[in-house]
Amino acid sequence: MALWATSMRRAIPGISKAFLGSNRVLETAGVSQLSKHLLPQWSGVPHRKISASATNFNDKVKESNTPDANAYIRSGHIKAAEHEKVKKVVVVGSGGLSIGQAGEFDYSGAQAIKALRESSVHTILINPNIATIQSSHSLADEIYFLPVTAEYLTHLIERENPDGILLTFGGQTALNVGIQLDDMGVFARNHVKVLGTPISTLKTSEDRDLFAKALNEINIPIAESVAVSTVDEALQAAEKVSYPVIIRSAYSLGGLGSGFANNKEELQSMAAKSLSLTPQILVEKSLKGWKEVEYEVVRDAANNCITVCNMENFDPLGIHTGDSIVVAPSQTLSDEEYHMLRTAAIKIIRHLGVVGECNVQYALSPNSLEYRVIEVNARLSRSSALASKATGYPLAYTAAKIALGHTLPELPNAVTKTTTANFEPSLDYVVTKIPRWDLSKFQYVNREIGSSMKSVGEVMAVGRTFEESLQKALRQVDPSFLGFMAMPFKDLDNALSVPTDRRFFAVVEAMLNQGYSIDKIHDLTKIDKWFLSKLANMAKVYKELEEIGSLYGLNKEIMLRAKKTGFSDLQISKLVGASELDVRARRKRLDVHPWVKKIDTLAAEFPAHTNYLYTSYNASSHDIDFNEHGTMVLGSGVYRIGSSVEFDWCGVSCARTLRKLGHSTIMVNYNPETVSTDFDECERLYFEELSYERVMDIYEMETASGIVVSVGGQLPQNIALKLQETGAKVLGTDPLMIDSAEDRHKFSQILDKIGVDQPAWKELTSVAEASKFANAVGYPVLVRPSYVLSGAAMSVIRDESSLKDKLENASAVSPDHPVVITKFIEGARELDVDAVASKGKLLVHAVSEHVENAGVHSGDATIALPPYSLSEDILSRCKEIAEKVCKAFQITGPYNMQIILAQNPDKPDTPDLKVIECNLRASRSFPFVSKTLGVNFIDVATRSIIDQEVPAARDLMAVHRDYVCVKVPQFSWTRLAGADPYLGVEMSSTGEVACFGKDVKEAYWAALQSTQNFKIPLPGQGILLGGDRPELAGIAADLSKLGYKLYVANKDAAKLLQPTSAEVVEFPVKDKRALRAIFEKYNIRSVFNLASARGKNVLDQDYVMRRNAVDFNVTLINDVNCAKLFVESLKEKLPSVLSEKKEMPSEVKRWSEWIGSHDL
């Protein structure tokens, strides 16, 4: 059987491992009595013989019927569980999105809260991430927008008196704080029960020493390793296990603080850095080049276990799984390997005592049955979100039910409605996950990828073959990727052997253009030859299309072969020299079209009512009927810098309102981390590309009633006009108007026409013209391309010599659209206006104030609402501008404007208001303004878009509020080795957090502590000051009065601070180890670096100061206005921090207490 399965898989291209099934018998309860009576083998073919006792059981359940939960319990073989008697449970969220911990925890936390509410448990969520779905009022009973720290959670527990807490749905943040609270005795003192996996198990899985001992007890092999807590111990350990070694950190996230060391020097600097981030590291023998395989396993308290999904990394061990291409189910494992690792996973989860979901990662030798366990995550993780979406098995929901004491056999599968949760999913399709990196946004960043994660998001594609699935995924990662495509490299062998974010394209280049054999590529990359043979299939079809060279050479056979191999219309059009629309028309004439298939978790072996859908050309029938004519909502696609969970909140809010108003909804999205791709958010969910081709295919097949393009960020906007021009009904604002607002030239002309002020601007066609204009208006100037998200290629230029490079860069971003150059106004304030209109009339709006001056991207800005320093006159002028703009563009739906407030020398009392940007779609601040003001802007926008139950206009800014909410950015600088932590017009934050307070200082104080690893420096500790801003003197004077010891790196900086004195310390810019010793010697716990420009190179003192503050895990403040606000917050809040009498801070309040009602 094993040989048959393996040979069949190799013989039939793309046949999925799980499709062959190969005797995946349910591994269930440890009680032998129970295992005899469970239904055998429903998750694959062929079936095993049924034992007599099992047959008796089947007589009761009737083998022909799909099993159901009640039948299991009625059979008498399984008792219903004793459920946890909890009435009020705290769910701990994960905080702001960062590299290594992203939207997957919004999805898992939201599912957990749904599961608790179903069981009539009162839920209290603590999560400062205001952009999440889980922090919407319709889910948890009460929400605290507060830092997920031991201090704030203790206050919450004392205030709310819960009887249970869930720690496994908030990533590493929740897990770490839970362990901390347990060590402090907070749970025991307050009689709070940790639900699900016990704390002792969490500690064992996180502490590398305990973990190694636990696995040795059951003879499970792990890589030879030594746990250490000092640099000297690390060096001794490396001698013991021998180089090369890998360092892994305890209690860390996404491989933070891990890496490979080939010698003593590399290990010394790496160990020092890792130990500044985490108390313990593991020095382990490197297994680079082995296969990496993962299993997602679920266990309940009655010891029932199932493996939900196994996944295989396309990349060999050595690249963090979060930065790897991952395929599910595994494609290259033999049946023996599959079962060996599956059995080990179940053995591990039982021995550790996990109650809920668990992820086991293995290294598997490519040449033998030898394997090692790399790590176990005894919590929901990024891989669990992927496994859940890949199989359709609601992992987080099931884990939450198990935490309440339910067993797997008694839980119905919430997705299929016909099976129990004790069913192992079976797949008749292939899923491919590819990470998304945004490394090009960062100056000096190292592009190499290794054991520490750097990607900011991921995509998931579903196809019936590996080729189809992979090509879809490649296009989903970035609209500029056509799919299977090559990129040129100066040193191709190096690009293949040293992995970077572009390595895949180096593999294609080697195969397609340089004639490298599969063996040679395998030797350089260690990628399995099975995967490389599939790439060779794609290369063959690619060349075939290239040789045809014309549209009319495309016959049905070649067209079908290309589509089955995953080629898009656009990709084919480039290869045959035609337009995308021509290829589409020819394809339809040849009657080649995609088929809609279900992800039903049962490989169609049982009827399942599921709404998870995908399209494939490797099929011959549809799995569904098209008679609902639903409204399509286009999601936001992959999370990347500039487009993140905020847009998922918008998409889900829109779909929920549509359903509330009686509309059937069709969601199109491909991001496995999102709530929008959850099984119960829409009538139909297409896990599909957000390309013109695929959206139009779905629109035509579904005969949809319309498409909403304004809630998914930039991707849907980019295809809106083309959809409308080819017959689709785009709902809301006319795409021609969207185009006018996106094109900087058209947009500026319209503003001039309606009398709305803007900075001086000019459309550019040559560098000479640009130079002439810049000299006329005076430097600095801002170069802005059209159609961008998060300020890509937008630059402030301060002199003529920089102009040429920047302009060429901007042209590369959007070659079809002209570039506009604008006068950049230094020292101006910036405001955000978020609004909703209906047929050109303003319905609601919010005016938020940036703390930083204009010049910092709005996505990286600290934003306060209600504004804390704006006059009534400025607010009414902002409203007037919002009204003029929505009338001019005839807006129906959401829109956002950025306005700068600049001093007018002629009228000092009346500052100028100039519009610098306008997006005719929802912006990333929509969840923030909605939750702060208590009105869901997307709900209002959706009603406006479909012209149904549109609410009357309201001026929300005229209402007096006795609170302020402050949103601050979450950066992931620690992940991006070498990147300069400097704020500018190009966005670099990966997430956001927001907190409420009685004033801006209190809200900012709480919000800062909500960001990852932010530590408040205490009086008596050292603060290092740097930069050239004159405001440093006043800030230093205040810090000195508060009792901090001040240090500077040179005499010029010391002069700048006068009359406040600061000690000049040695500052070796080239010697990181010596610099670390100086930070330790002077107990430097914070760096205030207020430089007016980026460093010219990596030896620039300000750059070194900022970068090493991040590397040494020291609090960094890098903006003048934020520094001033932070000092004001310290003055107000330090007395209570230092007081021995610990009182409840005034910011510890429920969201409902702040906003006063659930207007949302």
Swiss-Prot record:
<keyword id="KW-0479">Metal-binding</keyword>
<feature type="binding site">
    <location>
        <position position="248"/>
    </location>
    <ligand>
        <name>ATP 1</name>
    </ligand>
</feature>
<feature type="binding site">
    <location>
        <position position="375"/>
    </location>
    <ligand>
        <name>ATP 1</name>
    </ligand>
</feature>
<feature type="binding site">
    <location>
        <position position="292"/>
    </location>
    <ligand>
        <name>ATP 1</name>
    </ligand>
</feature>
<feature type="binding site">
    <location>
        <position position="377"/>
    </location>
    <ligand>
        <name>Mg(2+) 2</name>
    </ligand>
</feature>
<dbReference type="InterPro" id="IPR011607">
    <property type="entry name" value="MGS-like_dom"/>
</dbReference>
<feature type="binding site">
    <location>
        <position position="856"/>
    </location>
    <ligand>
        <name>ATP 2</name>
    </ligand>
</feature>
<dbReference type="InterPro" id="IPR005479">
    <property type="entry name" value="CbamoylP_synth_lsu-like_ATP-bd"/>
</dbReference>
<dbReference type="GO" id="GO:0005737">
    <property type="term" value="C:cytoplasm"/>
</dbReference>
<dbReference type="InterPro" id="IPR005480">
    <property type="entry name" value="CarbamoylP_synth_lsu_oligo"/>
</dbReference>
<feature type="binding site">
    <location>
        <position position="361"/>
    </location>
    <ligand>
        <name>ATP 1</name>
    </ligand>
</feature>
<feature type="binding site">
    <location>
        <position position="917"/>
    </location>
    <ligand>
        <name>Mg(2+) 3</name>
    </ligand>
</feature>
<feature type="binding site">
    <location>
        <position position="208"/>
    </location>
    <ligand>
        <name>ATP 1</name>
    </ligand>
</feature>
<dbReference type="InterPro" id="IPR005483">
    <property type="entry name" value="CbamoylP_synth_lsu_CPSase_dom"/>
</dbReference>
<feature type="binding site">
    <location>
        <position position="898"/>
    </location>
    <ligand>
        <name>ATP 2</name>
    </ligand>
</feature>
<feature type="binding site">
    <location>
        <position position="857"/>
    </location>
    <ligand>
        <name>ATP 2</name>
    </ligand>
</feature>
<dbReference type="GO" id="GO:0000050">
    <property type="term" value="P:urea cycle"/>
</dbReference>
<feature type="binding site">
    <location>
        <position position="287"/>
    </location>
    <ligand>
        <name>ATP 1</name>
    </ligand>
</feature>
<feature type="binding site">
    <location>
        <position position="320"/>
    </location>
    <ligand>
        <name>ATP 1</name>
    </ligand>
</feature>
<comment type="function">
    <text>Large subunit of the arginine-specific carbamoyl phosphate synthase (CPSase). CPSase catalyzes the formation of carbamoyl phosphate from the ammonia moiety of glutamine, hydrogencarbonate, and phosphate donated by ATP, the first step of the arginine biosynthetic pathway. The large subunit (synthetase) binds the substrates ammonia (free or transferred from glutamine from the small subunit), hydrogencarbonate and ATP and carries out an ATP-coupled ligase reaction, activating hydrogencarbonate by forming carboxy phosphate which reacts with ammonia to form carbamoyl phosphate.</text>
</comment>
<feature type="binding site">
    <location>
        <position position="917"/>
    </location>
    <ligand>
        <name>Mn(2+) 3</name>
    </ligand>
</feature>
<feature type="region of interest" description="Oligomerization domain">
    <location>
        <begin position="479"/>
        <end position="623"/>
    </location>
</feature>
<comment type="similarity">
    <text>Belongs to the CarB family.</text>
</comment>
<feature type="binding site">
    <location>
        <position position="361"/>
    </location>
    <ligand>
        <name>Mn(2+) 1</name>
    </ligand>
</feature>
<comment type="pathway">
    <text>Amino-acid biosynthesis; L-arginine biosynthesis; carbamoyl phosphate from bicarbonate: step 1/1.</text>
</comment>
<keyword id="KW-0547">Nucleotide-binding</keyword>
<dbReference type="InterPro" id="IPR006275">
    <property type="entry name" value="CarbamoylP_synth_lsu"/>
</dbReference>
<feature type="binding site">
    <location>
        <position position="917"/>
    </location>
    <ligand>
        <name>Mg(2+) 4</name>
    </ligand>
</feature>
<feature type="binding site">
    <location>
        <position position="784"/>
    </location>
    <ligand>
        <name>ATP 2</name>
    </ligand>
</feature>
<dbReference type="GO" id="GO:0004088">
    <property type="term" value="F:carbamoyl-phosphate synthase (glutamine-hydrolyzing) activity"/>
</dbReference>
<feature type="binding site">
    <location>
        <position position="375"/>
    </location>
    <ligand>
        <name>Mg(2+) 2</name>
    </ligand>
</feature>
<keyword id="KW-0677">Repeat</keyword>
<dbReference type="InterPro" id="IPR013815">
    <property type="entry name" value="ATP_grasp_subdomain_1"/>
</dbReference>
<feature type="binding site">
    <location>
        <position position="825"/>
    </location>
    <ligand>
        <name>ATP 2</name>
    </ligand>
</feature>
<feature type="region of interest" description="Carbamoyl phosphate synthetic domain">
    <location>
        <begin position="624"/>
        <end position="1012"/>
    </location>
</feature>
<dbReference type="GO" id="GO:0006526">
    <property type="term" value="P:L-arginine biosynthetic process"/>
</dbReference>
<keyword id="KW-0055">Arginine biosynthesis</keyword>
<feature type="binding site">
    <location>
        <position position="375"/>
    </location>
    <ligand>
        <name>Mn(2+) 1</name>
    </ligand>
</feature>
<dbReference type="GO" id="GO:0005524">
    <property type="term" value="F:ATP binding"/>
</dbReference>
<dbReference type="Pfam" id="PF02786">
    <property type="entry name" value="CPSase_L_D2"/>
</dbReference>
<feature type="binding site">
    <location>
        <position position="855"/>
    </location>
    <ligand>
        <name>ATP 2</name>
    </ligand>
</feature>
<feature type="binding site">
    <location>
        <position position="254"/>
    </location>
    <ligand>
        <name>ATP 1</name>
    </ligand>
</feature>
